[in-house]
Amino acid sequence: MVDAILTAVCVLRVHWWRVIHAFEIRSEALRAVTVRHTAIRRAVDSFLSLSIAVKLFSRDETFFDHFRQLAEYIGSSAVLLKQLLEHPADAARIAAEIKKVETDGDAIVYLINQRIDTSFVTPLDREDIHLLAKRLDNVIDIINGAARRVVMFRVIVSRAGGVRMADVIVRASREILESVADVTKPKRMAEHSRAIKVMEEEGDALYAECVGALFAHDEPAIEVLKWKEIFDALEQAIDECDDVSNVLESIALKNS
């Protein structure tokens, strides 16, 4: 009887140790799986953290695309303004095209302001981005204002002086487009700035010549009033091109 009991106890002990051993093996496997899963989870967390950091701290370069688009709008509206002054009989249609460009420009400025608010890191100082966008948009607004005056005043005869001033704006707009592409190159920007400054002085001389001619001849008072306002707007557009150039040159020097 005792022998039977001892035998049973021995058998139970063997089974018990087998169970314990199997459990330990399983536990080791579970621990290995847990460690592996933990490592994977940490790797994923690290990757996500890095992705977020890259997104947060990477510079948003789309601002330069927006600046280039605004510069192109200046160019297209300037060309249209020159056509309008050459053919005032078609002023209403051309002015409508300029107005569309002006509206598109406002939409770009809105996008720029939104990006300033949502970008963690900007390629330029936020104040410079805002100022440059404002200056570029101002040129388009002034060109639109000049076109609107030609329509409002029922101008039917072209004046060579007005066309020549518009041509200065066209040439300055081309220089602005090149300036935007070279905004981080101080030496190139200095060249663009000098070129636009020469155009601005040419515009001032043309303005004085055109306004002087209005009062030098026996012009009807209503024509003097009309064209004085138009010449004022054209000269303002040329001056604003120079202001854009000054902002671009300042940005180039800051970021050289």
Residue ranges and their predicted role:
Residues 44-256:
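Cytosolic, long alpha-helical scaffolding segments
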Residues 28-33:
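Short Gly/Ser/Thr- and charged-rich N-terminal loops/segments
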Residues 16-17:
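Tryptophan (W) side chains
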